[in-house]
């Protein structure tokens, strides 16, 4: 077996499949593009779903890739086991309706055992297969596998909901008896017993059926086009090839672990408990790549996943004695390890480090808040005479504040308490089940549409025409090809079309289809790409249409031009965001509609008013400069040499269109654009908002819509001016400033009157002094409008020696507010208010000299006042 680095293993995989006629698909962003069913790209095949369900036919039906992926539904196992990871790489080879079982098995065996490639010892390989899949069993024997190395497994059938499914055959590497201390042998495989001896290195899925949950598996229909979908975990392959005890002792993780050793002063012991080292090494890889791909820590969705990973890694750093932000220092090491295939981490190093460090600092503050929350729980339990912290509270500390259960146990132990471990585990299990259910929902692929897949006639989109004559080459009605159609909604394909099919965030063209006499025979309401790339026109048929007849296709030119203005403005906006916010503010989604444009981009905070003004100003300046908009068609490599911005995660063919706007913007884009920025006229941002963790959205309008937006603002200002009796709109700010000054003066006078009223009322209240056990106290209900007035009473009370203790209660709205103030050390205001608050169904706390509580049971106010004496 060859000794190879991880980079060599990855490259050898891709090189082998290239010799078998496969196209190498580059690894795409971990953040899914145009796939709302996935939180993360979680497998090698996730980015190829559109090929497997027949939505799109690939240029080459043979594909190979090395795809980074994230899965976090089993995060608790990371660091505990030898092979669990949150981020991993899947090596894959795929056949979309091309070769099938025989070639897949033959080539897999060749790659693994040939001296030219990995050169695995054949006797170390074992294969599992689906019992009914005799073809796979026979093929393995034909390529030279000993029958004793073939294990039937009932679970070897891949399906997730409706869609492509089929048997799978897995390949395992036997690491020997040293990893089988109980000498169980092949039962480990046959009975699916968790073990470290037989390591799964490759799974080959033979996708040959359309799964239908409504029928038994034996009745699944065969796919019109059978597929091969395989996955081999790079980390596992590398561990086997490098003879590592676990995945973590490979060149993918050890450089990170060595850096953690330097930062902590601790030593990684390959035979000891190294969970903290492993967690940190794993999680910083996920964080570096995910942030580099545009995801940012937050409170929901993928942002919450990143926040949880960072906090878990940070806590494990503390276990190693690292009590300051340190994860950000590991980003360069991650980048260097992966640089040969993933240069983006080093390219975005500064941005990734900034986000990680900021989040670490934020977590330090959150941890402090969590400690206060934990102390509050302990205090409440002591008051109730209880000694077990509830599982739900332990889980909240874990989930909200990032407290590992061990830390909560330490706090409990110091207070002479314990934690409800079972309750915590139950709450944790509920969360994991929700995560798994969510992951399964997004996993299935759609059913293949055989009719559209079989339409292979050529159809060309003419970018420059608004009207042309073309032959009708396909009619699809009720999911079948027909020769003619006379009514209803149907789909048409023409040899050439001026209609733009919805793509790249640009909506489809609308328009009409006319016969030779000029009569409108159909209206086009939508255009989408068919699986083989043709423009599929959805039309309302007004008169008979026949196959192979010539028709005139005319787009709605006014509608198209309005969309073009918005699309070109989107490119200007993208460039302005880079210039003003930074290069990290890259496109995360867009929509170029008729009346507006919507642009989503990665950014870690709200865009300020000043930044929005600068962005809007810069876009308009480029419009007024009347920059020429040019498009050229070239190959992808030339386009990149030109400096064209490619959207990360988008797939591009061999030939691409490059759109340049003067020397201001250059992007790869297949959409339609104006010829000169002056055609846009005007650009206005109407809204900026957050739509998820680390993602912002700008809604903007151009041309007539922009003018109308400004007119609407002007009308609103004029209405305000009229109300303020300002002769001109420009005088409105001065008038408003005057009103604000008047308001401030009135508020000041009102506060002074309140103080005087409070002082007057206090004169009566402070006379009502009682005494219990040598403690002088005042307990009274007062009439105030807000809790702040209670503090004013307390401030007045502190000025003189009225009593040792003051208890004030006020009914404000439908709530009850309580203030307790103390002047002596033996009367703790915070403790007393906690004892009194439950009487009014409330809670409270505070310092020894002043504390407050809130409740809702107003009829119990007098009971609370009467209870004060009993507490002294």
Curated annotation (Swiss-Prot):
Enzyme class name: ligase
Entry-linked Pfam families: DHHA1, tRNA-synt_2c, tRNA_SAD
Cofactor note: Binds 1 zinc ion per subunit.
InterPro entries (UniProt xref): aa-tRNA-synth_II/BPL/LPL (IPR045864), Ala-tRNA-lgiase_IIc (IPR002318), Ala-tRNA-ligase_IIc_anticod-bd (IPR018162), Ala-tRNA-synth_IIc_core (IPR018165), Ala-tRNA-synth_IIc_N (IPR018164), Ala-tRNA_ligase (IPR050058), Ala_tRNA_ligase_euk/bac (IPR023033), DHHA1_dom (IPR003156)
Provenance organism: Streptococcus pneumoniae (strain Hungary19A-6)
GO biological process, one term: alanyl-tRNA aminoacylation
Name of the featured protein: Alanine--tRNA ligase
Entry's transmembrane regions: none
EC number(s) reported in the record: 6.1.1.7
One GO molecular-function entry: aminoacyl-tRNA deacylase activity
PANTHER family: ALANINE--TRNA LIGASE, CYTOPLASMIC (PTHR11777:SF9), ALANYL-TRNA SYNTHETASE (PTHR11777)
Catalytic activity: tRNA(Ala) + L-alanine + ATP = L-alanyl-tRNA(Ala) + AMP + diphosphate
Main function: Catalyzes the attachment of alanine to tRNA(Ala) in a two-step reaction: alanine is first activated by ATP to form Ala-AMP and then transferred to the acceptor end of tRNA(Ala). Also edits incorrectly charged Ser-tRNA(Ala) and Gly-tRNA(Ala) via its editing domain.
SUPFAM superfamilies on file: Class II aaRS and biotin synthetases, Putative anticodon-binding domain of alanyl-tRNA synthetase (AlaRS), ThrRS/AlaRS common domain, Translation proteins
Keyword terms of this UniProt record: Aminoacyl-tRNA synthetase, ATP-binding, Cytoplasm, Ligase, Metal-binding, Nucleotide-binding, Protein biosynthesis, RNA-binding, tRNA-binding, Zinc
Binding site for Zn(2+): 567, 571, 669, 673
């Amino acid at each position: 077996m060859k000794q190879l680095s991880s980079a060599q293993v990855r490259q050898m995989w891709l090189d082998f499949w290239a010799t078998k006629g496969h196209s190498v698909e580059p690894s795409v962003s971990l953040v899914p593009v145009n796939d709302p069913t996935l939180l993360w790209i979680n497998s090698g095949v996730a980015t190829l779903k559109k090929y497997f369900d027949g939505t799109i036919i690939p240029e080459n039906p043979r594909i190979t890739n090395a795809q980074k992926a994230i899965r976090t539904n089993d995060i608790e196992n990371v660091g505990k086991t030898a092979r669990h990871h949150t981020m991993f790489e899947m090596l894959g080879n795929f056949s979309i309706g091309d070769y099938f079982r025989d070639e897949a098995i033959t080539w897999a065996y060749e790659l693994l055992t040939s001296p030219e490639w990995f050169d695995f010892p054949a006797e170390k390989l074992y294969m599992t297969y689906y019992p009914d899949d005799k073809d796979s069993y026979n093929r393995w024997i034909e390529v030279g596998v000993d029958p004793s190395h073939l294990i039937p497994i009932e679970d070897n059938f891949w399906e997730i909901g409706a869609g492509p499914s089929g048997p799978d055959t897995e390949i395992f590497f036997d690491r020997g008896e040293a990893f089988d201390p109980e000498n169980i042998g092949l039962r480990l495989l046959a009975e699916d017993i968790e073990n470290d001896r037989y390591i799964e290195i490759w799974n080959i899925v033979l996708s040959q059926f359309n799964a239908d949950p409504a029928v038994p598996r034996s009745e699944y229909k065969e796919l019109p086009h059978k597929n091969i979908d395989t996955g081999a975990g790079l980390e596992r392959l590398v561990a086997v090839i490098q003879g590592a005890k676990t995945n973590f002792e490979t060149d993918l993780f050890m450089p990170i672990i060595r850096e953690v050793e330097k930062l902590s002063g601790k030593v990684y012991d390959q035979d000891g408990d190294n969970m903290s080292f492993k967690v940190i090494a794993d999680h910083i890889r996920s964080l570096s790549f995910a942030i580099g791909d545009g995801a940012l820590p937050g409170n929901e969705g993928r942002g919450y996943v990143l926040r949880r990973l960072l906090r878990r890694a940070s806590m494990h750093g503390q276990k190693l004695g690292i009590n300051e932000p340190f994860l950000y220092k590991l980003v360069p090491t991650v980048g260097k390890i992966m640089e040969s295939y993933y240069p983006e981490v080093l390219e975005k190093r500064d941005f990734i480090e900034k986000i990680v460090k900021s989040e670490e600092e934020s977590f330090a503050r959150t941890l402090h808040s969590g400690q206060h929350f934990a102390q509050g729980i302990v205090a409440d339990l002591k008051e109730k005479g209880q000694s077990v912290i509830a599982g739900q509270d332990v889980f909240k500390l874990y989930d909200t504040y990032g407290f590992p259960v061990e830390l909560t146990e330490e706090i409990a132990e110091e207070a002479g308490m314990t934690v409800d471990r079972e309750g915590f585990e139950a709450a944790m299990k509920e969360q994991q089940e929700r995560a798994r259910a969510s992951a399964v929902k997004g996993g299935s692929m759609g059913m293949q549409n055989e009719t559209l897949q079989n339409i292979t006639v050529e159809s060309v989109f003419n970018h420059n025409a608004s009207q042309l004559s073309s032959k009708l080459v396909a009619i699809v009605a009720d999911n079948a090809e027909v020769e003619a159609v006379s009514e209803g909604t149907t789909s048409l394909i023409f040899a050439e079309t001026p209609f733009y099919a919805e793509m790249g965030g640009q909506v489809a063209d609308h328009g009409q289809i006319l016969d030779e006499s000029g009569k409108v025979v159909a209206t086009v309401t939508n255009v989408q790409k068919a699986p083989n790339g043709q423009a599929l026109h959805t039309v309302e048929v007004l008169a008979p249409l026949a196959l192979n007849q010539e028709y005139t296709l005319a787009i709605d030119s006014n509608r198209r031009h309005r969309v073009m203005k918005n699309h070109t403005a989107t490119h200007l906006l993208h460039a302005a965001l880079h210039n003003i916010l930074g290069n990290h503010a890259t496109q995360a989604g867009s929509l170029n509609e008729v009346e507006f444009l919507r642009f989503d981009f990665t950014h870690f905070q709200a865009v300020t008013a000043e930044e929005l003004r600068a962005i809007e100003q810069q876009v308009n300046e480029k419009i007024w400069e009347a920059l020429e908009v040019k498009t050229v068609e070239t190959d992808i490599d030339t386009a990149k040499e030109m400096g064209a911005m490619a959207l990360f995660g988008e797939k591009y063919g061999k030939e691409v269109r490059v759109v340049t706007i003067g020397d201001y913007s250059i992007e790869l884009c297949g959409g339609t654009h104006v010829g000169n920025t002056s055609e846009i006229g005007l650009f206005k941002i109407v809204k900026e908002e957050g739509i998820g963790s680390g993602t912002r959205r700008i809604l903007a309008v151009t041309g007539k819509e922009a003018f109308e937006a400004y007119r609407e603002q002007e009308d609103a200002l004029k209405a305000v001016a009229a109300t303020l009796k300002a002769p001109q709109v420009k005088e409105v700010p001065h008038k408003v400033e005057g009103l604000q000054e008047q308001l401030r003066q009135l508020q000041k006078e009102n506060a002074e009157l309140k103080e005087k009223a409070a002082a007057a009322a206090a004169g009566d209240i402070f006379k009502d002094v009682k005494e219990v056990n040598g403690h002088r106290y005042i307990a009274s209900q007062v009439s105030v409008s807000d809790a702040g007035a209670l503090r004013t009473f307390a401030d007045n009370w502190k000025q003189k020696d009225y009593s040792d203790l003051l208890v004030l209660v006020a009914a404000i709205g439908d709530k009850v507010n309580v203030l307790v103030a103390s002047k002596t050390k033996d009367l703790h205001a915070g403790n007393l208010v906690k004892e009194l608050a439950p009487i009014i169904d409330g809670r409270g706390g505070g310092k020894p000299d002043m504390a407050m509580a809130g409740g809702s049971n107003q009829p119990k106010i007098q009971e609370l006042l009467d209870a004060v004496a009993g507490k002294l």
